[in-house]
Structures are given as structure tokens and as C-alpha cells.
């Protein structure tokens, strides 16, 4: 996803591009939740769920391999006007109309990357985001079925409601983030990230206070709302990752994907330790923990977020780094020569 965004997204359309590209997190559950719920209660059983999803995945992968190109320059359906719009302003990747730089800088300045607080703001925010996302994706059906005691055939349908709403919120957030001009880019990042992660954290804490036995409908509404609101993240840290790291955004998104995998493993472990019996009181603790993580990581992002391209994305930085490395190698050799000549 990072490589595709880096190469194919125009800088002025980062928000909507990221929103559409990352909407797989919403589109997949819209299909998976109700279909799996219907199949697992039918006569064909669970094996059909795996066969169906395997077939769909194979078809989509084949279509992607046939249609996709790594660079817009290599795609036969791209004309010159589209290329200018997509490639313009991308530093070492593109120098202007008809001047694609073949010597584009692929070296990632790791020391500068990991010492940049704007990058740490993105990574910390992504950790909080995916802790909330994985809780919703993996355990929303469990909460609805085991805590709210909704029948399993209705659980899938109820679980699919929030991804549908979240999909449209994500598109709205991406489009509005690109089009709003009366607010600075940095403040837009803070506002959209707070609407997504901050509000999700608050709603998780509110849900922890509600009684699932006497207020099941209200609990379901708050749970769905907490997941839907996360759609605003396309205008938050996701967009910041593109704005800060520019041509190196694929590496930033690779780090974000790694944190998603960490959260994918950490969330079930946390739930197993705290709420293995699915008791409402235990689930309240889980919701409190995730709510605090979301709120704290959002505050960190708001403090250190940036909307400007980092210094290490510029050609001048790469040139200076090469000169510095050359100096470190040449200076000792020259000193050695000076000592030899002095001895003579």
C-alpha cells in the first residue's frame, strides 16, 4: 500500500487517495461478516467460508497482477496530462514535465527517519489506531454475541453496519481534508485525528460505563459509533505519513503495517488475559485500556504532528549526506599521506 500511494497519488489528492486505498478495512467486513454468519449457521458449515474467501482472494489477486504497474509511467492507460498531475512536486522522483529522474534516490536515511519526532508521532498514532481497529475487527462479533447476547445469525449483520458507515465517513474525510483551505494543514491533521482516535477512545470509555444487560441497544449503538468514527483517520496520521515522508512514504507505511501486525497479535492476547470469560465487568476493563491508549496516542500525535515534508526527503539532504560520508572516508587517507610526506 505504501509503494502504491507513493508512486500513484498526486500530492494534492493524498487524503482521498489514502481514504479509498485503505477502505479495504471496511469493504472486507461488509462482505465477510454477514456471509460468514449465514454460512456458519447453514448446512454447509464453516469449511464453505474458507473455500469462498480463498476463491475470491485468488480472483482479486489475479486481477491486480494483470492490471497493476509499479510506476504510472509504465502503465499503458496513462496519458501525459495524468502523468504530470501524479508526478508533479515529488522531489527526487520527478523534476518537471517530461523530466523523470532515472537516478531517483532510493536510499532511506534511517538515522534521520527514526530521529524525526514527526515520524514518531505517526507511528505512535498508528499503534493506538490499530489497537482500536483490531479490537473492533476481531472482537466486535464476540462482544455482540457473548456480552449483548444477540443471536449469531444476527451478529454478522450487526457487525457489518459499522464498516458500511465508516466507509462513507472515510471518503468524506479524505475529500474534505483535501478541499478545506481555511484551516492550516497541521491543524487539519490534528482535528481529523482527534475526531477518529480521540472520539473512539472516549466512546470506548463511555461503553465501559454502560450496563449490557439493561441497556443492550444503547451499548450496540455506542459500539457501532465508536467504530464508524475511526473513518476520519484518513485525514489524520495516514495523511501525515504522506506529507512528511513524500518519496519515502512506502517505508513509513511499511512501519505502520508492522505496527498493525503487532496490534493484531497483542489485542487477542490482552483479551484472553482479561476477558477470557466474556464477563461484562472484564470487558469494561478491556474497553478502558483501549480507550486510554487511543486518547494518549492521539495527544502525542497532536503535539508532534507535522504537515511539512521532512528535511531528509530533499535532494539536498541526500547530497549533503553523501558528501559527509565521503569526507569521513577521504580525511583519514589524506592525513595518512600527510604523515608519510612529513616523514620523508
Task: Report the location of each language-model feature.
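C-terminal transmembrane helical hairpin of 12-TM major facilitator-type secondary transporters
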Residues: 189-235
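Glycine-rich segments within core transmembrane alpha-helices of 12-TM secondary carriers
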Residues: 13-41, 48, 56-57, 162-170, ...
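A membrane-interface helix-boundary motif in multi-pass transporters
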Residues: 41-54, 188-191, 273-292
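A late C-terminal transmembrane helix in Major Facilitator Superfamily
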Residues: 246-277
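Extracytoplasmic gate region of multi-pass secondary transporters
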Residues: 111, 115-170, 234, 267
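Flexible cytoplasmic loops linking transmembrane helices in multi-pass membrane transporters
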Residues: 76-135, 182-192, 206-209, 336-338, ...
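Central mid-sequence intracellular linker of multi-pass
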Residues: 14-16, 40-115, 299-324
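Helix-to-loop junctions at the C-terminal end of transmembrane segments
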Residues: 169-186, 275
Amino acid at each position: 500500500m505504501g509503494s502504491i500511494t507513493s508512486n500513484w497519488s498526486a500530492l494534492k489528492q493524498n487524503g482521498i487517495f489514502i481514504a479509498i486505498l485503505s477502505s479495504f478495512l471496511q469493504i472486507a467486513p461488509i462482505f465477510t461478516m454477514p456471509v460468514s454468519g449465514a454460512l456458519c449457521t447453514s448446512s454447509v458449515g464453516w469449511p464453505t467460508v474458507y473455500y469462498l474467501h480463498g476463491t475470491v482472494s485468488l480472483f482479486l489477486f489475479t486481477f491486480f497482477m494483470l492490471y497493476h504497474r509499479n510506476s504510472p509511467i509504465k502503465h499503458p492507460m496513462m496519458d501525459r496530462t495524468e502523468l504530470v498531475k501524479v508526478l508533479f512536486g515529488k522531489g527526487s522522483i520527478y523534476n518537471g514535465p517530461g523530466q523523470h529522474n532515472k537516478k531517483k534516490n532510493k536510499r532511506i536515511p534511517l538515522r534521520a527517519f527514526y530521529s524525526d519526532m514527526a515520524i514518531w508521532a505517526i507511528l505512535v498514532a498508528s499503534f493506538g489506531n490499530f489497537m482500536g481497529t483490531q479490537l473492533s475487527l476481531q472482537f466486535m462479533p464476540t462482544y455482540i454475541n457473548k456480552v449483548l447476547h444477540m443471536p449469531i445469525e444476527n451478529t454478522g449483520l450487526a457487525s457489518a453496519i459499522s464498516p458500511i458507515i465508516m466507509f462513507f465517513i472515510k471518503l468524506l474525510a479524505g475529500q474534505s481534508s483535501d478541499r478545506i483551505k481555511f484551516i492550516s494543514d497541521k491543524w487539519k491533521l490534528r482535528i481529523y485525528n482527534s475526531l477518529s482516535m480521540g472520539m473512539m477512545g472516549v466512546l470506548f470509555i463511555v461503553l465501559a460505563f454502560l450496563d449490557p444487560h439493561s441497556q443492550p441497544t444503547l451499548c450496540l449503538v455506542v459500539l457501532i459509533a465508536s467504530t464508524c468514527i475511526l473513518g476520519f483517520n484518513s485525514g489524520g496520521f495516514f495523511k501525515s505519513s504522506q506529507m512528511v515522508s513524500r518519496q519515502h512514504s512506502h517505508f513509513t507505511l511499511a512501519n505502520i503495517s508492522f505496527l498493525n501486525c503487532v496490534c493484531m497479535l497483542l489485542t487477542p492476547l490482552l483479551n484472553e488475559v482479561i476477558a477470557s470469560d466474556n464477563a461484562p465487568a472484564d470487558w469494561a476493563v478491556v474497553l478502558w485500556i483501549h480507550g486510554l491508549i487511543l486518547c494518549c496516542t492521539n495527544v502525542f500525535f497532536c503535539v508532534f504532528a507535522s504537515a511539512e515534508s521532512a528535511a531528509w526527503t530533499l535532494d539536498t539532504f541526500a547530497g549533503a549526506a553523501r558528501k559527509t560520508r565521503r569526507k569521513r572516508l577521504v580525511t583519514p587517507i589524506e592525513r595518512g599521506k600527510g604523515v608519510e610526506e612529513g616523514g620523508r
